[in-house]
Amino acid sequence: DLIRNERRHGTDGRISMKMNSLVDEGIITELVGAARDGVSIDLCVRSIVSMRIGDLDGARVRVRSVLGRFLEHSRIYRFAHGDEGKPAYFIGSADMMTRNLDLRVEVLVPVKHDKHRAWLDKVLGILWSDDIVRFELDPDDTWVRRGPETFTFEHDAQGRIMHWATELQLSQGAPSPYDVDEETDPSGLLRPIKDTLARIFGQGPDA
C-alpha cells in the first residue's frame, strides 16, 4: 500500500529503502510499476538484488550496495507521502524477501519522533554520498565499483556513520569511551567500545 500510495503521487513520489536483500517478486513488481510512473526510488541493498533496471529507461531508480568491515542488519524504509501526506519512516527486521514477508515473524516499526527521523535521514544521506566507496547497478544490469580508488576511513560509509554518531553523543554530554578507566567505568562495559574505536580512529576521533 505504501508503494502504491507513492505511485499515485507520480513524479512527486519518493521511496528510499535500505536493506540486505531485495528478492520478493511482488515487491519488485510494485517498485517497477512505481518507477514507470515517475516515482523516484533509491535502493541501498547490501546483498542480493533481483530487480532489473535495464528495462526502466528514463526511470528515476538508483540501486547501490555499500559494504564495510561490519555485517549490517539494519533496515530503513522511507516513503515521502506515507504518513497522511507526510514522510513515513520504518525500521525493522524484514528484508524484501518472500521468506521474510510470508514465512517468518518479522517486525517493522514506524518511527514518529522528529529526532529519530533526522537520524535516519542522516544515515541515508551518508549512504548516498558521492564520495564513498560503493557498487552501483548500471542500466545494463551490471554492478560497477564507484567512488575513490582507495578504501580509506574517509570514504567508508560505516566509519563515517560511526564517527558522526560518536561525536553527536559526546556533544550532548555522553561519557567518552576514550576516557574510560576503572574509576569511570567500574563495570567494564565501555572498554570494548574504547578498544574498537581506537582501532578505527586511532587514539581518538580526531587523531
Feature annotation, model-predicted:
Residues 1-207:
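PLD/PLD-like phosphodiesterase catalytic module centered on the HKD motif
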